[in-house]
């Protein structure tokens, strides 16, 4: 993966690492022309279909196809070396995994659990996105429930796959986090597409073509209106995370049901399951109390339907300064904490990760204002101090 925007700690880079894909992110000297399917670097032009080779470790991109090799993670010498490290380490390593294939790769590398399954990534699949968009677009509770009911089997299947692969190891599933607008087409693109459709309609003469265009326009117009309503000045601090679960409680209910139906199903197959459900972006303890009541009621209902008891944990992600400072109150209702250091760093410094890494942050590091990129190296005095406070107060 090669991008002209973002940075090495941006979400795109994190996901690329999770997928095991070499990535060079934020190569600002390249210009990507999507219309003509090419990119330019200075006077050089690379067309779609030409080979380039990417070294995700050094950040170097080569023209042409270099000879490559797949690393052997089962090398006996490597396994021996890591076994020596295991004798002395005091920390365990859990992996990010959203799909069973990610979990399998993580186990091969020695992960002891799944520390973060981003449940929303599953909604972006082509067979699921229309149902999720339908849930967003409707104003009617019955239609929303129908859309969520259509999504339930997909989520259940994905969670069951993770539980099967992990075979009793802990799996932390984070409920939906991103703002809803991320699941809709870009507003500018929608306006452009609508303009194009209306021009085509103006020149259409065939009735069948006119009917098709009118249907497309109605659909796009509905998407545009909803995207306009959901548009926020600062979406990353808007309707997302725990706020979504409170705003649309049926969404939390569906996800919790999928988790526990999957757990019951896999336990019946003779496989031990240890789910841990995590609420994102908590800022006030009352948010957690609200979501815990919804979760416990649905989990109890599912376990009663299946005639079994699943041992699980309920926790939250500490990624806002207020959550860190009130961790003692939050800990009364959470069985574990996970620290979301990217959002915690953004909200502590008051800077946008993706914008800063290609802008002023470079100047800050080069001039010595900041000793290092705070998204790549933990800021011990600020963000680290908040984590320290949260741990001590939480305990």
Regions found by a protein language model. Name each.
Residues 29-63, 140-142, 147-149, 373-382:
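A structural-propensity feature for long, helix-poor, extended segments
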Residues 58, 73-80, 84-395:
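Conserved alpha/beta-domain cores
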Residues 16, 52, 259:
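Residue-level signal for inorganic ion chemistry
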Residues 17-20, 56, 263:
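Generic short alpha-helical hydrophobic face used as a protein-protein interaction/packing hotspot
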Residues 10, 61, 346:
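Short glycine-rich, flexible loops that bind phosphorylated cofactors or substrates
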């Amino acid at each position: 993966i090669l991008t002209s925007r973002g940075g090495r700690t941006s979400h795109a880079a994190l996901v690329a690492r999770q997928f095991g894909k070499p990535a060079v992110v934020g190569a600002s000297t390249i210009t990507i022309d999507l219309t003509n399917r090419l990119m330019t670097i200075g006077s050089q032009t690379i067309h779609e279909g030409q080979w380039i080779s990417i070294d995700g470790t050094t950040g170097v991109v080569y023209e042409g196809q270099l000879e490559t090799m797949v690393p052997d993670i089962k090398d006996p010498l490597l396994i021996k070396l890591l076994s020596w490290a295991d004798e002395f380490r005091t920390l365990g390593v859990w992996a990010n995994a959203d799909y069973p294939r990610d979990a399998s790769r993580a186990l091969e590398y020695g992960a002891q659990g799944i520390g973060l399954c981003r449940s929303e990534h599953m909604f972006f699949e082509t067979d699921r996105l229309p149902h999720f968009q339908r849930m967003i677009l409707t104003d009617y509770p019955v239609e929303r429930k129908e859309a969520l009911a259509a999504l339930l089997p997909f989520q259940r299947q994905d969670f069951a796959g993770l539980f099967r692969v992990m075979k009793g190891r802990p799996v932390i599933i984070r409920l939906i986090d991103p703002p809803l607008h991320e699941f809709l087409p870009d507003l500018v693109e929608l306006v452009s597409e609508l303009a194009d459709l209306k021009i085509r309609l103006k020149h259409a003469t065939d009735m069948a073509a006119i009917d098709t265009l009118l249907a497309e326009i109605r659909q796009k117009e509905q998407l545009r209106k909803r995207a306009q309503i959901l548009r926020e000045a600062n979406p990353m601090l808007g309707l997302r995370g725990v706020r979504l679960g409170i705003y649309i409680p049926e969404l939390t209910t569906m996800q919790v049901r999928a988790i526990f139906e999957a757990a019951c199903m896999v336990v019946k197959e003779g496989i031990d399951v240890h789910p841990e459900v995590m609420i994102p972006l908590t800022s006030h303890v009352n948010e957690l109390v609200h979501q815990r009541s919804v979760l416990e009621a649905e989990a109890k209902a599912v376990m009663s339907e299946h005639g079994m008891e699943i041992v699980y944990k309920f926790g939250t992600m500490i990624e806002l300064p207020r959550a860190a400072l009130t961790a003692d109150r939050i800990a009364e209702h959470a069985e574990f904490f996970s620290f979301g250091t990217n959002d915690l760093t953004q909200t502590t410094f008051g800077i946008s990760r993706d914008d800063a890494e290609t802008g002023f942050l470079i100047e800050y590091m080069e001039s010595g204002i900041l000793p290092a990129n705070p998204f790549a190296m933990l800021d011990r005095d600020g963000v680290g101090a908040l984590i320290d406070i949260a741990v001590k107060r939480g305990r």
